[in-house]
Structures are given as structure tokens and as C-alpha cells.
């Protein structure tokens, strides 16, 4: 009886060892396949970057041409910003006055694409600051952090960093923010390297949403004005129809 139990225990132990060995072998094979996939993914990423680098060069003169046309349209960037659902909330009344001098906006990837990008605001001569260009640069570091640098603004005498006041909402007008948009540049002077997940949300919106097609947001504002105008026309037409109906009722009553 004891011998049978001993044999059974030994058999179970051998089965467990066999299962463990098979499991280890399967995991090793799975890891090899996963390593192969990683190599393919790395190669794909490198090739995607090469394509992106190639087309960045091709896009550059087209973006330059777009900027030249935009310069001929009054308040283009101010209108596009104000019409954007996120960016429009960031401009104080004083910011809007400054944005009237904004002549061009440029987003430029680093040459290798993966190491970062910069956003540059170019201004016509204005009464607010000396700078012709304000640039904010994002450099992606190997340790997973991002180095952020920005042009220190040289405000003209008596101007300084424009901090708005909290304006009450008037009718359908949006409530204006308390802090100037231009703190976006000055904040970078006080920041150390930040983690990737703490990336600059404003920069992401400008780079990924506004910059690719600002005309979408510029036209949004124009479309809304046209829509409001159509509404006014419809209301006038309805009032005219109502007056005609009243006249007809009066004539029937006189008969």
C-alpha cells in the first residue's frame, strides 16, 4: 500500500516537472516571437520616420506659400484662434489686441522628427514688445522627459506681461480668461524637464489640430456669421408674412 502511494507521488511529481518544462519552453518560444515582432516594429518606425522626414521637406515650401497668402487676410490667426473651441478660451482682451499683429504661425519638426519640434509666432512691428518672433521648443530626451524652452518676451516700456481681469459673461459672449495667453512663453522659463504624459496641451492642439488646417476654424467663424445673418433674414421674412396675414384678416372682417 505504501509502495503504491510512493509510486503515485513520484508519477505526479514527474508529470508536474514535465508540465513545467513544457511551459518554460512555450514561454521561451513566445519570447522569441515577441522579439521578432519588436525588431519588425522598430524597422517600421524607422521607415515611417524616413517617410515623414521626406514629406516634411516637400511640405515646407507649400506651408511657406500658405503663410504668404494668410498675411494678406486681416486678422486671420486671431479669427482662427477665437473660433477654435479650446484655444479661443485662452485669449484675454489684451491678447486679442496683440494677436492683430500676428502675421504668421509655423510648426517645425526637428530634422529627425522624433527628437522634438518648435512653434513660432511671427509678429509685425507692434506697440507691445520688441520681438519679431516668439518661439517655444520641445526637445524629447532619451530618459523619457521633455525639455521645454521659449523666447523670453522683451516687453516695451509700460506694457509688461498682460494679465487680463475676469470679465463677466455679457450676453452670448464668452467669459474672458484671467491669465494672458503669453504666459505660455514665460512659463517655460521656470519649468524643468517634464514627463511625456505632462506634455504641453496647448502645443499639442496647435501642432496637431490648428496648424494642419487653420482655414477650417477661420471659416467656422465666417459660417457662424452667415448663419446668424440667415436667421435674421428668416425672422424678417416671417414677420413680413405675419403682417400680410393680419392685413388679410382685416379685409375679411370689413367684408
UniProtKB/Swiss-Prot annotation:
Can form homomeric and heteromeric protein complexes with NRP1. Binds histones H2A and H2B and associates with chromatin in vivo. Acts as a histone H2A/H2B chaperone in nucleosome assembly, playing a critical role for the correct expression of genes involved in root proliferation and patterning. Required with NRP1 for the maintenance of cell proliferation and differentiation in postembryonic root growth. Involved in both intramolecular and intermolecular somatic homologous recombination. Disruption phenotype: No visible phenotype. GO terms for biological process: double-strand break repair via homologous recombination; nucleosome assembly; somatic cell DNA recombination. The acidic domain is probably involved in the interaction with histones. GO terms for molecular function: chromatin binding; histone binding. It comes from Arabidopsis thaliana. It holds the Pfam family NAP. Residues 19-60 form a coiled coil. Residues 213-255 are annotated as: Disordered. It comes from the Eukaryota. Belongs to the nucleosome assembly protein (NAP) family. Ubiquitous. GO terms for cellular component: cytoplasm; cytosol; nucleus. The gene is NRP2. Keywords: Chaperone, Coiled coil, Cytoplasm, Nucleus. It is found in: Cytoplasm; Nucleus. Double mutant nrp1-nrp2 shows arrest of cell cycle progression at G2/M and disordered cellular organization occurred in root tips resulting in a short-root phenotype. Double mutant nrp1-nrp2 also displays hypersensitive response to DNA damage and impaired somatic homologous recombination. Residues 221-255 have a biased composition (Acidic residues). This is NAP1-related protein 2.
